[in-house]
Amino acid sequence: MCTNVVRVFVILYLLAECGCIKYDVDDNVHICTHTVMSHINYTSWYYNDKVIALATEDKTSGYISSFIKRVNISLTCLNISSLRYEDSGTYKGVSHLKDGVIVTTTMNISVKANIIDLTGRVRYLTRNYCEVKIRCEITSFALNGSTPPHMILGTVDKWKYLPFPTDDYRYVGELKRYISGNPYPTESLALEISSTFNRFTIVKNLNDDEFSCYLFSQNYSFHKTLNVRNICESEWEALNNNDNASSVPASHNNLTNDLSSMTSQLQNDDNDYSTPMNVDNLIMIVVITMLSIILVIIVVIAAIAIYKRSKYSRHTDN
């Protein structure tokens, strides 16, 4: 428990290092001084400590090319419309007052953009277990005078932290590892972590399934989240569908065989029975049978009578 608390504080501390105001792409921002305009002699405006314009009572000059169409600068304000990701950085206005006093206004701006690619790929899958490799990669990043980036990937209980000094690390895709000694192309930086899930484990804390990737520096802060268990659930469902699909033909054949067997049995049963007789034939048979029985009875009675008569005649003669 103590370890988890420490990790949370570390993450929050690192994320707090940005110290900037966050905007979305296409937002508008206004950076203004609270000094009365009539008291200002001129104002110099800076972006990451580079002069971008000089504003006087009569005119403003020295726009940098990328700001010409999107920036309105005066003695007291710098207004930027339709923010871009590359506009992130430190803005400063230095106003020189007519009485010789210098007033400085500073603002750190972070423009959120989709420069992080967070993906999960299944490496091993069974009906009960699923292993996923989670990868967080910087797809595009311009320092723009900021400090080198730092990256955190994982959950509260399982995470990796990696700083990227500009002269120490470079990720080489062909080698699938980081090498040192050369400046890195920031767009190739990545962190990877693996995690295993049990299909039948009861999820008590949904945060255990949520993997987050943080990228931050002095003027930048980016964050993406991925539910990795959902990836495994999709794969398990696909596996079940494949199993069901493969069992359908066998079941269909069995059903067909059963129906054929039943049909054949019925046909055989029909063959075992003779064709039904009509009523007239049946009556004729009954009459003949009865007459035959009567005839047999008459013959028997006659035979008995003849036998008795012949026996009586012999007795009389004697």
UniProtKB/Swiss-Prot annotation:
Span of the signal peptide: 1-20
Gene Ontology biological-process annotations: viral process
Gene3D superfamilies: Immunoglobulins (2.60.40.10)
Domain of life from the UniProt record: Viruses
Recorded topology in the membrane: Single-pass membrane protein
Subcellular location: Host cell membrane
Known glycosylation sites: 41, 72, 79, 108, 144, 219, 244, 254
Keyword Signal among record annotations: yes
One GO term describing the cellular component: membrane
SUPFAM superfamilies on file: Immunoglobulin (SSF48726)
UniProt keyword list: Glycoprotein, Host cell membrane, Host membrane, Membrane, Signal, Transmembrane, Transmembrane helix
Pfam families xref list: Pox_I6
InterPro entries per UniProt: Ig-like_dom_sf, Ig-like_fold, Poxvirus_F5/I6_dom
Induction entry: Expressed in the early phase of the viral replicative cycle.
Membrane-crossing residue ranges in chain numbering: 282-302
Similarity comment: family membership: Belongs to the orthopoxvirus OPG049 family.
Role played: Plays a role in the spread of virus to neighboring cells ex vivo.
Protein name (Swiss-Prot/TrEMBL): Protein OPG049
Native source organism of the sequence: Monkeypox virus
